[in-house]
Amino acid sequence: MTDQAAFDTNIVTVTRFVMEEGRKARGTGEMTQLLNSLCTAVKAISTAVRKAGIAHLYGIAGTTNVTGDQVKKLDVLSNDLVVNVLKSSFATCVLVSEEDEHAIIVEPEKRGKYVVCFDPLDGSSNIDCLVSIGTIFGIYKKISKDDPSEKDALQPGRNLVAAGYALYGSATMLVLAMANGVNCFMLDPAIGEFILVDRDVKIKKKGSIYSLNEGYAKDFDPALTEYVQRKKFPPDNSAPYGARYVGSMVADVHRTLVYGGIFMYPANKKSPSGKLRLLYECNPMAYVIEKAGGMATTGKETVLDIVPTDIHQKSPIILGSPEDVTEFLEIYKKHAAK
């Protein structure tokens, strides 16, 4: 009987959670339809990621995407899955994917009111060595009265109504940020549902970990070089920060959310506009971190305030615990004033 007593009979799934939030806001239920469909794609991708070796899904598919990355077989599969489930949710009108050069306009008979920007498989260069990868998404409402077009996706991150990511790691986790905050759901493979495990997640005010690719150190600007040196050799003789960098944005940002600290993918001499894409990488992650009480900046401005001009626009990003990001900004402003 003890085993039965330990089984939760009042579980909160993603569907239940979003329905409850929609009921409070007197919503139409379209967001529930959209997120339900997205969860279906995430479950399918999670299974595909775990079966990749057996199903011969590793390796290059023979093409490059619009941003020049080599496309893996799993990328192609994941993109097709997300596009198809979002179209069939009857809740979307415009889809922007890292893998497609142009925005996808949903057929008139399937259209809803939401615009979704997504990276179907972020960190895919890590697939072959089994490092954690993920799916990132940002959801906007269509605000123009015109027929759906690519322009509907060119909204600042402040307009997001929901954003988040799925992390395919030792378990599959869905992190969902909405107006009410950030909540984490774990995929229970036994019942095939995402179960709420962490409600109203908040990032630490200050962490003890910094995360960036120091292989580009020779191209860092002086402000970044000074900041990293202060983390390694604190001027007040406090404990130095630990360095952690996976190279998969979902994994690095999730660790930053859970443990605190700072994640940086700044501009440098080789990439003056940064390397990460604004609509489906920077904005969703910035939204999650801000809703958790953190900060996200380019150094010059808040990430969520950027008005995009291109669906594949790039942006620098520095995000994490508010005290850590504030310290970075103080050093950045000091150097900018010189």
UniProtKB/Swiss-Prot annotation:
Transmembrane segments: none annotated. CDD domains: FBPase. Mg(2+) 2 binds at residues 98, 119, 121. Its cofactor is Mg(2+). The modification N-acetylthreonine is found at residue 2. It catalyses: beta-D-fructose 1,6-bisphosphate + H2O = beta-D-fructose 6-phosphate + phosphate. InterPro entries: FBPase_C_dom, FBPase_class-1, FBPase_N, FBPtase, Fructose_bisphosphatase_AS. One of its GO terms (cellular component) is cytosol. AMP binds at residues 18-22, 28-32, 113-114, 141. The keyword Iron-sulfur does not apply. The modification N6-succinyllysine is found at residue 151. The modification Phosphoserine is found at residue 208. The modification Phosphotyrosine is found at residues 216, 245, 265. Substrate binds at residues 122-125, 213-216, 244-249, 265, 275-277. Mg(2+) 3 binds at residues 119, 122, 281. Binds 3 Mg(2+) ions per subunit. Catalyzes the hydrolysis of fructose 1,6-bisphosphate to fructose 6-phosphate in the presence of divalent cations, acting as a rate-limiting enzyme in gluconeogenesis. Plays a role in regulating glucose sensing and insulin secretion of pancreatic beta-cells. Appears to modulate glycerol gluconeogenesis in liver. Important regulator of appetite and adiposity; increased expression of the protein in liver after nutrient excess increases circulating satiety hormones and reduces appetite-stimulating neuropeptides and thus seems to provide a feedback mechanism to limit weight gain. Belongs to the FBPase class 1 family. PANTHER family: FRUCTOSE-1,6-BISPHOSPHATASE 1, FRUCTOSE-1,6-BISPHOSPHATASE-RELATED. This is Fructose-1,6-bisphosphatase 1. It comes from Bos taurus (Bovine). The lineage of its organism: Eukaryota, Metazoa, Chordata, Craniata, Vertebrata.
